[in-house]
Amino acid sequence: MRDYVNWLRHASPYINAHRDCTFVVMLPGEGIEHPNFGNIVHDLVLLHSLGVRLVLVHGSRPQIEARLAARGLTPRFHQNLRITDVPTLECVIDAVGSLRLAIEARLSMDMAASPMQGARLRVVGGNFVTARPIGVVDGIDYLHTGEVRRIDRKGIGRQLDERAIVLLSPLGYSPTGEIFNLACEDVATRAAIDLKADKLLLFGAEPGLLDGQGTLIRELRPQQVAAHLERLGADYQGELLDAAAQACRAGVPRSHMVSYAEDGALLTELFTRDGGGTLVTQEQFEKLREATIEDVGGLLELIRPLEEQGILVRRSREVLEREIGQFSIVERDGLIIACAALYPIADSDAGELACLAVNPDYRHGGRGDELLERIEARARALGLKTLFVLTTRTAHWFRERGFQPSGVERLPAARASLYNYQRQSKVFEKAL
């Protein structure tokens, strides 16, 4: 119970932040076939109940493949896009129609079996996507395979205003009445861009983007994507990553890659600080900056446990407010996770590095080194020649970074007179 209460408390800022936001969610056909599909639907209904404006885009690739196989037809692709002749288009229409009904039925069933019962959740679809043929590429005619020409932004917006979930299928219609087979990733990306969505959420088989060693990459800038696309080649994660980057370049603040196979992956990504997938964003999710008076409360939360352990000298709120200009901080999505302060020492060309602290959950990301570099740069800018640090627990860390053992007698008089002999802090210094 305590874990649940703590989770809810930590999630509450995100619940408030996501209310009335527009999220475009892309779920491929593989995700619909997966045993976790029911949990994903439940989580989508939960998001809707929390005031999120939802547009759900579904895929249909494995379902199309099954219908082609049943009819003895061979799938044809070029550059990872299906070539859609008339028999294939018939399979596409059959698969998409069946999936729409299945998704609507599951959303309705989940509503009746959850606290949302009686909330009149509505799922709305329609001819919201106008398409055009891809045409001939490299001498290959794509026939009834198309690309998104336009999203009916106003029509979708009206349905979202009426608190409906909008369901978009990977089909588009031309002004002349033709039907085109579309890539669900393209539909989702264009919908997110044209609707000016707050988020694009892309489901895949993996937890997110993995590096060459299989480690999850938690955050990327769009300009970092090209190297990963080259490594991934035709892998489906590459398609998702490309879609995420395109959306961000076109103004969508954040795109997320999450797993359809992991129960709760969507909620973990949206309602925890570090998420569980890969975030692609132009925004600086974590930033190193100088502290302001508004940061005093967050600083107190960070340093208080270390003060209680005797690692840091205790500072009152009044002292922090008075000395806030000395602090540099690392802020991660609104939370202060690290800090350090520089105090120039009167009547000398030396300064003191003090109150270097990093949240225990973030102590292996090099943030202490970043803060040390920032403090040293600030000291040099002030014309200081020597940086002192007094510590009781972290002597080895500072020695590994160029600080040499020193003594109280080496401190400038203004600082030596304040030395606390009860703490018996060790003194180190570093020439700048």
From Swiss-Prot:
CDD domains in alphabetical order: AAK_NAGS-ABP, NAT_SF
EC number annotated for this UniProt entry: 2.3.1.1
GO biological process, one term: L-arginine biosynthetic process
Enzyme class: transferase
UniProt cross-references to Gene3D superfamilies, sorted A to Z: 3.40.630.30, Acetylglutamate kinase-like (3.40.1160.10)
PANTHER family associated with the record: AMINO-ACID ACETYLTRANSFERASE (PTHR30602), AMINO-ACID ACETYLTRANSFERASE NAGS1, CHLOROPLASTIC-RELATED (PTHR30602:SF12)
Name of the molecule in the record: Amino-acid acetyltransferase
Organism encoding this protein: Azotobacter vinelandii (strain DJ / ATCC BAA-1303)
Top-level taxonomy: Bacteria, Pseudomonadati, Pseudomonadota, Gammaproteobacteria, Pseudomonadales
